[in-house]
Amino acid sequence: MKSIKYRGYRRTISEYTKRASSLPTVHETTEINITGLREFCKENDVTLTAVIIKVLASVQKKHPLSNSFIARNIFLRKTIYLPDEVDMAVAIEMHAFDSHFSTIVVLRDINRKTVREIGSEIDGLRHLTYTQLPLSGLTTLMDRLPDFMKSIGLGIVSQIPALRQRLFGTMGFSSLGKYGLKSFDTLFYLNVGYGIGGIEEKVILKDGSVQTVPTLTITQTSDHRIVDGAEAARILAEIKRIFESGEYKTILKV
């Protein structure tokens, strides 16, 4: 029987996902007609991923709870913090140590970046090695610690607002549509995370005629301690409206 070492990075992932899975989450899914969006991306030579990230970040202005987290204040009381910046934690797949695994990189201050800058940053990060990623020194140190010290370290970081935002980000993004998945739930130690599924051609009835349109499925996972089900639904409905109404064109800086 073949065996694989349970390396430090796997143990770090384990500690992170333990904390993420402990959150009381609510999951909501919507399908979005992206006919206009697909044409927009082609005409402007921008990636769909970068456009989606930019739009998700923009929703924070109308729904600030979509970009928030719980940590301790100076009196050690739990407090909901609402950062001014949207720091998007993006899950990417890495190959290192003879293994494939997911890791998280944080894109800083999304609302200040253009779609092309976001796309270029993601593309650049995907071509880096594990040890070249931002904050790789800290993650390498975490990988070397015993499990109980990893748990203590993550616990301390999660309760200090500035450190939490810097290391974990404020909003999560994962895209697995290219593997044929329609929808999936994300596992981020964050208040809100988005799972982007694949694009499907769907038949709809519009203006008395049958039409085929491309649809994209987005699943939103929210921390129920901060975002109630109704508010989560409003956030997701706003995202759908922006995409289908074409309002994203006024939001995006190409």
Model regions and ranges:
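C-terminal catalytic/motor cores of large multi-domain enzyme assemblies
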Residues: 1-254
